[in-house]
């Protein structure tokens, strides 16, 4: 089997960045990744671009990767746009690796880009998240999440996606409550996970919380 190596990596700083766009964030990441790999854009033979929310929140659709990568100096090559929810980035990487193993290319680029902070468009953001569920069963899904740990969640906090929260945040909270009830997990144990993560982020100049 062909041995595949990741020659360079990069990411933008984590944060809300209201003035940035998917295109501008992509340009930052691609430029830094090429520099890390020690190659120029001319070496790239194909690219995979993963994203899920840009069509709904920025209006850029159908050719997301082509537009973003052109601004980053990458064009005139095959570009595949990948959308697969939270697995979009890993799916793009897998597809790129498969293409290399098939002997189609030697040097490729994989990009995962997302921007979900639009404070002036809360309803659009909420709708974008709900698009990651079965939209034909929204009421059933809301009820399932609300009832998952109904006896453990105060009544005024029940209801998926209420009070400006993401539907998925409510799902995770319900699952955490259910785990605590089932296995005796404590708040202190969950807090230890957060403390560990914050300890790591203190050493990462690109982390949102330092």
PLM regions and their residue ranges:
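Beta-strand segments within the central parallel beta-sheet cores of soluble alpha/beta enzyme folds
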Residues: 6, 41-51, 78-84, 108-112, ...
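Conserved catalytic cysteine-centered active-site region
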Residues: 2-5, 17, 54-108, 115-172, ...
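Short, well-ordered amphipathic alpha-helical segments that serve as non-catalytic structural scaffolds
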Residues: 23-38, 64-68, 175-176
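N-terminal extracellular/periplasmic Venus flytrap/periplasmic-binding protein-like
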Residues: 191-210
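Short polar catalytic/cofactor-binding loops
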Residues: 9-14
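Phosphate/pyrophosphate-binding loops at sites that engage ATP/ADP/AMP, CoA/4′-phosphopantetheine
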Residues: 31-45, 179-186
């Amino acid at each position: 089997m062909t041995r595949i190596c990741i020659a360079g990596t990069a990411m933008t700083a984590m944060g809300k960045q209201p003035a940035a766009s998917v295109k501008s964030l992509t340009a930052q990441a691609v430029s830094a990744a090429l520099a890390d790999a020690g190659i120029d854009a001319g070496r790239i033979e194909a690219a995979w671009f993963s994203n899920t929310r840009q069509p709904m929140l920025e209006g850029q659709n159908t050719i997301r990767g082509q537009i973003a990568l052109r601004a980053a100096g990458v064009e005139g090559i095959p570009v595949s746009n990948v959308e697969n929810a939270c697995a979009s980035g890993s799916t793009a990487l897998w597809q790129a690796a498969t293409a290399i193993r098939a002997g189609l290319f030697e040097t490729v680029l994989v990009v995962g880009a997302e921007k979900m902070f639009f404070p002036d468009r809360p309803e659009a953001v909420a709708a974008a998240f709900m698009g990651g569920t079965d939209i034909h069963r929204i009421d059933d899904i809301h009820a399932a999440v609300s009832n998952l740990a109904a006896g453990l969640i105060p009544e005024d906090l029940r209801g998926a996606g209420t009070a400006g929260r993401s539907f998925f945040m409510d799902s995770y909270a319900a699952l955490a409550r259910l785990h605590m009830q089932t296995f005796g997990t404590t708040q202190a144990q969950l807090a230890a996970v957060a403390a560990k993560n914050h300890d790591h982020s203190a050493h990462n100049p690109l982390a949102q919380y330092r």
